[in-house]
Amino acid sequence: MLHIVNKSPLERPSLDACLRIAEPGAILLIEDAVYAAARGSAAAARLAEAGKRHKVYVLLPDAEARAIADRLIEGVATVDYGGFVDLVAEHRNCQSWL
């Protein structure tokens, strides 16, 4: 399953809920959720740990728009919009965490 998170971990508990209950699969961080993947962020350690169970992706245009593309934690892969579409097509189900 592809889990899509779009809210900052400082704004909503969506990412924590996803990490806590999601079955292994892929997690895509988009919009303000990309802040979680920045080195030194409050959620970086939790996200790095989640990388053991999930493949974690960040939408690169969103990271670039927030000036954190060069500060992403180890193990996080970046995708462009075409990669976003590919992830959706590769996974049978998608869950958006609001």
Segments predicted by a language model, with ranges:
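Short, conserved loop/helix-junction motifs that constitute active-site signature segments
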Residues: 19-23, 45-53
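Histidine-anchored nucleotide/phosphate-binding helix
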Residues: 10-24
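Structural motif corresponding to alpha-helix initiation and N-cap regions
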Residues: 12, 40-44, 78-81
